[in-house]
A protein has these predicted regions:
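Conserved structural position within tetratricopeptide repeats
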Residues: 2-4, 31-38, 68-75, 114-121, ...
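Residue-level recognition of tetratricopeptide repeat
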Residues: 18, 52-55, 89, 93-96, ...
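Residue-level detector of the short coil/turn that links helix A to helix B
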Residues: 24, 58, 95, 107, ...
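Canonical tetratricopeptide repeat
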Residues: 15, 49, 85-86, 132, ...
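TPR alpha-solenoid repeat register
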Residues: 12, 46, 80-83, 129-130, ...
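Short coil turns that delineate tetratricopeptide repeat
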Residues: 6-7, 41, 75-78, 124-125, ...
């Protein structure tokens, strides 16, 4: 947006940025939001929009820095639980995008883990903090060699089980399936250890059968269960 002889306000730049964002021109939209914030740096809400735009443009460094700036500047609602949750998700996305560099990936994922841990501390009965800690750990340990996500998925299930209706709700039902699948596969990998074989087979069947109760048409798990009989 070229001002020419006109004088544009922060609101004008925000409006144009919104138009560009709807067109998925996130780089250009970000430039407009930056101008808006330069004109009115009392509007901390612009920082949140700007961070989201950077994230959509996969500029995670700026997205994280800007969201942290938003959290520090928002004196009214500073450091709400949801802020830590959203910042954790940005860090998680950054970690996933940085898998070519283990060091960088781990840095972002550990930062995400720290954010989700705050969510758990402030809202211990909200399963989402546990779930996203599980996911961050799973990305750090993709071959399940260390089972980093195992205790975290177990904690997720413990929290979900506090409300029996969670197995009926679509969103939490998917979380159950995700956790059962991971824990079943983790135990399946333990069947190669003779000392743990029988216990691991039983645990695998338990988790995967629980998964099938919620997702009976899952052919992948149905076939995987058949392989257990040949072990």
């Amino acid at each position: 947006m070229n001002p020419g002889n006109n004088v544009f306000t922060a609101r004008d730049y925000m409006t144009y940025g919104d138009i560009l964002s709807k067109q998925k021109k996130y780089g250009e939209a970000g430039a407009q939001y930056e101008k808006a914030y330069e004109l009115d740096n009392t509007r901390t809400d612009i920082l949140k929009v700007l961070s989201d735009t950077y994230e959509r443009n996969k500029d995670y460094v700026k997205a994280i820095d800007t969201y942290e700036k938003y959290m520090n500047a928002d004196t009214v609602n500073n450091q709400r639980v949801m802020d830590y949750y959203l910042l954790g998700q940005i860090c998680y996305s950054a970690g996933q995008a940085a898998q070519d560099s283990v060091e960088l990936m781990n840095m972002y994922l550990l930062k995400a883990d720290t954010m989700f841990q705050v969510v758990i501390e402030r809202s211990p009965m909200d399963y989402r903090g546990y779930l996203w800690r599980s996911r961050a750990a799973a990305v750090r340990d993709p071959e399940l060699k260390e089972g980093l996500a195992k205790p975290l998925y177990e904690e997720t299930l413990t929290v979900l089980d506090q409300d029996p209706s969670n197995k009926e709700k679509a969103a939490t039902k998917r979380v159950y399936i995700e956790a059962y699948k991971y824990l079943g596969y983790y135990n399946y990998l333990q069947t190669t250890n003779p000392a743990k074989k029988n216990e691991a087979i039983a645990a695998t069947k338990d988790y995967w059968n629980k998964m099938l109760e919620l997702d009976p048409g899952n052919t992948e798990i149905l076939e995987a269960l058949k392989t257990l009989d040949s072990l």
